[in-house]
Amino acid sequence: MPVTLSFGNRHNYEINHSRLARLMSPDKEEALYMGVWDRFKDCFRTHKKQEVLEVLYTLIHGCERENQAELNVDITGMEKIHAFTQLKEYANPSQQDRFVMRFDMNQTQVLFEIDGKVIDKCNLHRLLNVSENCIFKVMEEDEEELFLKICIKYGEKISRYPELLEGFANKLKDAVNEDDDVKDEVYKLMRSGEDRKMECVEWNGTLTEEEKNKLRCLQMGSFNITTQFFKIGYWELEGEVLFDMVHPTLSYLLQAYKPSLSSDLIETNTMLFSDVLNKDYDDYQNNKREIDAILRRIYRSHNNTLFISEKSSCRNMLI
């Protein structure tokens, strides 16, 4: 059954599943491909299909930019996620629930479905620019949702501001990480009871060396009050405060993701994921009871927050 789209000055334009799958491709030639018979029929159409598809392609993917090979980046996955989201938005409201983007059972692929049928997919290792031997921790459903929202924002930034891909794409991550919509979503998941624009609270506590060592896994093996709690979420429940660490896959996506294919970067990304982010997460979970007890004392003695500064310096805003 075709999907009905409305875009530009086109209304109720019907497109089948195979064409929607093609339109998700950032490769313009592939996206706009028409067979011999289709091209022949286009000669007799009042409104040329080729022209309509070009308009839709531009709306989805943005203006043409330099070849990805020249920029030495791999952003195909992010572009597909953005394209699928755009196609869903152009679909008539009554048909938008036919579009579903989700993870597979093993959380190694993002699947794009229409009417329950997979029309395309992207590999998570390639999407995050890490090697195939990189191990991902299992995400909960709400973490999956946040992951996809962040990826949609990456795709949006790439489409609107292709200049962010220049210079090894170093500015792309910052553009997403500093986006207000992304910050709001991260806080909604991990610090739902806290106003992210609140004033920080000055450090007024003391910690033993043993306690400091326990907290090192919160900050990649180091300890500094001004940055120690930026990966820790918390929320109140029935008079108790609960803590958790931002999932390592989300931390990587927000803090470290770079699509550049420059020499050794994939290996470096993989080492960061495995040897730092996953390790910190495991260390926290394995010592959660003792660490949470320390965090609870700090939280309660600092006006129920870990947004703590020292000598007016603070980097403890969540991620």
Swiss-Prot record:
Primary location: secreted
Induction: Transcription is induced inside host cells and is dependent on the SsrA/SsrB and PhoP/PhoQ two-component systems. Highly expressed in host macrophages and when grown in an acidic environment.
Pfam families the record matches: SopD (PF11047)
Compartments it resides in: Secreted; Host cell membrane
InterPro entries associated with the record: SopD
Gene Ontology annotations for the cellular component aspect, listed alphabetically: extracellular region; host cell membrane; host cell plasma membrane; membrane
GO BP, sorted A to Z: protein secretion by the type III secretion system
Record note on disruption phenotype: Mutation leads to a prolonged survival of infected mice. Deletion blocks Sifs formation at an intermediate stage, before fusion of late endosome compartments with the SCV, and impairs bacterial replication in mouse macrophages but not in human epithelial cells.
Annotated keywords: Host cell membrane, Host membrane, Membrane, Secreted, Virulence
Motif (Required to target late endocytic compartments) on chain: 37-44
Source species, domain of life: Bacteria
UniProt keyword Cell inner membrane, yes or no: no
UniProt KW Membrane keyword: yes
Free-text domain note: The N-terminal domain mediates secretion by SPI-2 T3SS and targeting of late endocytic compartments in host cells.
Role this protein plays: Effector proteins function to alter host cell physiology and promote bacterial survival in host tissues. Contributes to the formation of Salmonella-induced filaments (Sifs) in infected epithelial cells and to replication in macrophages.
Family recorded in the similarity comment: Belongs to the SopD family.
Family matches, as NCBIfam families: PRK15380.1
UniProt-recorded name of the protein: Secreted effector protein sopD2
Lineage summary: Bacteria, Pseudomonadati, Pseudomonadota, Gammaproteobacteria, Enterobacterales
